[in-house]
A protein has these predicted regions:
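Acidic, Ser/Thr- and proline-rich intrinsically disordered linker/docking segments
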Residues: 1-31, 35-77
């Protein structure tokens, strides 16, 4: 596989205490892909990729785990 590949995607981020999933928003992030280790088709509109790589929050180039630690307890990630 020729590197690097970059995938831009979105993730639904909700607050830790929100069990209904109504209080959140989509977050754009970029993944620098090292390898695609597998995939499966959920539906014609949704394909799930198993990716090995590094994810970055698009708005400030921070690693995605650093960004997520602002919303969640890092010990639970």
């Amino acid at each position: 596989m020729i590197k690097p590949y970059t995938i831009s995607t979105q993730m639904w981020l909700e607050h830790e205490d929100d069990n209904l999933g109504l209080n959140g928003s989509f977050v754009d992030f970029r993944v620098n892909v090292d390898s695609i280790d597998g995939y499966w088709v959920e539906s014609p509109e949704e394909i799930v990729l198993i990716i090995r790589g590094t994810a970055y929050y698009i708005e400030n180039e921070a690693p995605i785990l650093h960004f997520l630690s602002e919303f969640f307890n890092p010990m639970r990630l």
